Amino acid sequence: NEPAAYNTELKPGGGWDMWRKIAAQDPSFGHPDKFCSDPEQTNWMSATVETLDQRIIPYIKNICKRDPFTGKVVTGGIVTVKDSSWLMSWTINRQPQFREQPKDHCLVWVYSLFTDKPGDYVKKTMRECTGKEICMEWLYHIGVPVDEIEDMAEHSANTVPVMMPYIDAFFMPRAYGDRPKVVPDGAVNFAFLGQFAETPRDTIFTTEYSMRT
């Protein structure tokens, strides 16, 4: 019943702090501030909706044309609400996702790209919304009657939001050299791994990219 914390502090000892200290030693070690200096450009927000009864399920079935409790594919990918002011998307993977998950509960992953714009049903920005309010916005977009939305968000779902200030950092505009080479020129006994290491002809945002570095 509270909005997710929006904490942009880069704490000492964290990954960004370490990269800054490394980069200060040589220009070839990259420029981390190109990626971590503007959280308004790099933040992204999501929420996990857990259905608690069968009231929401028919609306999911109506869109997916699948029963989420068969143990098979449900959405088959991301469902994007094109006319959402938040540019909301949601997806449901094979259920159950966790061993202890009740068999009649469904987990839905909801996220939005525009966390600073008012919603279409809840007239608040996503970052200002509680989990319940985010659920209400989602229920509105999947076709739940307006007079049932608040009650269903309150009693038929449990929604937990999370704000990630730097999750889109690797998409920030950059120049060659802003990311260090995996093995910088002249390096002998060290290398850079992960999303912020420069790898030719490859695209970030995947686990595979990190593994290939």
Residue ranges and their predicted role:
Residues 1-212:
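C-terminal segments that line or cap access tunnels to active or ligand-binding sites in enzymes
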